[in-house]
From Swiss-Prot:
GO biological process, any: peptidoglycan biosynthetic process
EC number: 2.5.1.7
Keywords: Cell cycle, Cell division, Cell shape, Cell wall biogenesis/degradation, Cytoplasm, Peptidoglycan synthesis, Pyruvate, Transferase
Presence of keyword Cytoplasm: yes
Lineage of the species this protein comes from: Bacteria, Pseudomonadati, Pseudomonadota, Alphaproteobacteria, Rickettsiales
GO cellular component, one term: cytoplasm
Top-rank taxon, per record: Bacteria
Entries under CDD domains matching the protein: UdpNAET (cd01555)
Name of this protein: UDP-N-acetylglucosamine 1-carboxyvinyltransferase
Length: 419
């Protein structure tokens, strides 16, 4: 099994180009079911993207891949969709597989999707996905580990209030509503940039969507959607991760190819810690200024601080001067990286959904194990900050969400290699 060997202690210096957003491209790929052909550019080279390709092919899609140095183009032809079951063997690898449920159901009137897998960071139930589709007239049962959904005729527009903000359920609802009969109004929606990007893609396909980027989205269903091409937005989670990498290594790095508006909350949090963050033409420059202050953090739905960056921020706070309180409001089991950070000398105590982080002068290298995607990269950041050797095991998590991570870090001076 592969592992990463990290020799820390070198400030990162240089520039890093940000890849396409995993959490945007996956629902956009699922949206290809709604039309006959979709041409997607700025697609990151990730195992989750490969899993979604396998899933779409399993349903009968034909996918042409055009490979470039830093990205893929995908041309997805779905005119021959002929299978409506998303099998466990594929779905277990990635929770985002559930996003084929809405498109299959709204276009073909039937879908059978295995209950999803992915990172082990909490329950992340499918209740809201099922509830909103039922409100559109779907008949849904869970049998033998599968969501079995059907509709008599087209799905119907609905007014639906999510009882809590759910990115995944918002996406499935939008994907179903664009071909439903009549008007759908969704309340308490997720507002994440990746949801906005999906909506812009659907609008380019001919969908009628109002309220994009707000908590209330209105959709007037169409009989069909058009073929189109679409460029996926850049990954704010990847950008934030490298911003923290610059800070934790006391470096000076330009993060390029990212819209400042979608990383502003990350930049402001870093500035609060004493790190210099300057907006540049196509991104930000992050510079260590001699001190790292402890600050508190709460994760919340966008525009709040992303849960996908909580572990990375905790690594940074583990070498700050003072005590910080990190509160995880999204997932109930997202502190699994804490024991591994403590193996490296971090002083962290977890109390329910809160972690008290007492900064230490320096972490020390150790053999550590990744429990999920974001935890894996938080341990890499921790390893980069040490003056010794860190070995990270179970790095297959990493390849689900970070393209060319070793190359991007090495180009900025990091000593990191995969063996």
């Amino acid at each position: 099994m592969q592992k990463l060997i990290i020799h820390g202690g070198k400030p990162l210096e240089g520039s890093i180009n940000i890849s396409g957003a995993k959490n945007a491209v996956l629902p956009i790929m699922a949206a290809s079911i709604l039309t006959n052909k979709l041409h997607i550019t700025n697609v990151p080279k990730l195992t989750d993207v490969s899993t979604m390709k396998d899933l779409l092919r399993n349903h009968g899609a034909c996918i042409r891949i055009i490979e470039h140095t830093d990205e893929f183009e995908l041309i997805i032809n779905t005119t021959n969709i002929n299978k409506f079951t998303a099998d466990y063997e594929i779905v277990r690898k990635m929770r985002a597989s559930i996003w084929v449920l809405g498109p299959l159901l709204t276009k073909y009137g039937k879908a059978k999707v295995s209950l999803p897998g992915g990172c082990a960071i909490g329950a992340r139930q499918v209740d809201l996905h099922i509830a909103v589709l039922k409100s559109m007239g779907a008949e849904i049962e869970i049998e033998d580990g599968y969501i079995n959904a059907s509709s008599k005729g087209r799905l119907k527009g609905t007014h639906f209030i999510f009882d809590k903000v759910s990115v995944g359920a918002t996406i499935n609802a939008i994907l179903a509503a664009v071909l439903a009969k009549g008007e759908t109004v969704l309340f308490n929606c997720g507002r994440e940039p990746e949801i906005v990007d999906l909506c812009y893609c659907l609008i380019k396909m001919g969908a009628d969507i109002l309220g994009v980027g707000s908590s209330t989205i209105t959709i007037k269903g169409k009989d069909c959607l058009n073929e189109t091409s679409y460029k996926v937005l850049s990954d704010r989670i990847e950008a934030g991760t490298y911003m923290f990498a610059a800070a934790i290594t006391k470096g000076d790095v330009k993060i390029c190819g990212i819209d400042y508006n979608i990383i502003e909350n990350i930049a402001l949090k870093l500035i609060e810690t004493g790190i210099k963050v300057v907006q540049i033409n196509n991104g930000v420059q992050v510079t260590y200024k001699g001190k790292l202050n402890s600050v508190d953090l709460e994760t919340n739905p966008y525009p709040g601080f992303a849960t996908d960056l909580q572990a990375q921020f905790m690594s940074l706070m583990s070498i700050s001067s003072g005590v910080s309180m990190i509160t995880e409001n999204i997932f109930e089991n997202r502190f699994m990286h804490v024991p591994e950070l403590c193996r490296m000398g971090a002083d962290i105590v977890v109390r329910g959904n809160k972690a008290v982080v007492r900064g230490v002068e320096m972490l020390k290298g150790a053999e550590v194990m990744a429990s999920d995607l974001r935890a894996s990269v938080s341990l890499i950041l921790a390893g980069l900050s040490t003056n010794s050797k860190t070995v990270l095991h179970r790095i297959y998590h990493l390849d689900r969400g970070f393209q060319d991570l070793e190359k991007k870090l090495s180009n900025c001076g990091a000593n990191i290699k995969r063996v």
